């Protein structure tokens, strides 16, 4: 109490738009907080950058996207997506994946397989089904005779794929 009363202080917000996330409903994490504090200013980070690139069309106009689509179509191969599967909006958002799938279909990709990393950190630990079930319904609507899309594999994000807990890197 004495420190707060007798010395200058400033409260910092470490979530939402204060640290460059899309909305104030996004809880943030230490990474985005450190980036904002270290930079001394707020700048778009992670999922917000991806959202912006989808909204302004830069993602789909990029050489990488164009080459990926061209390669899959020319070789009659499968397009694969691997990534964090949640709406935590720190590292990713399911809407990013949906936008890429819709665009892949529009551009004539015929076969897509999705490899999901269940979150449990930026969202609730046991929340996987609340994301998988509606996403399966979305895939069913998107699927057609000319577009075969489905979840091919899945797993968790902890230890091996994203987080370093008890890992000796």
Regions found by a protein language model. Name each.
Residues 1-158, 163-167:
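Active-site nucleophile/metal-coordination loop of metallo-enzymes that catalyze phosphate/sulfate
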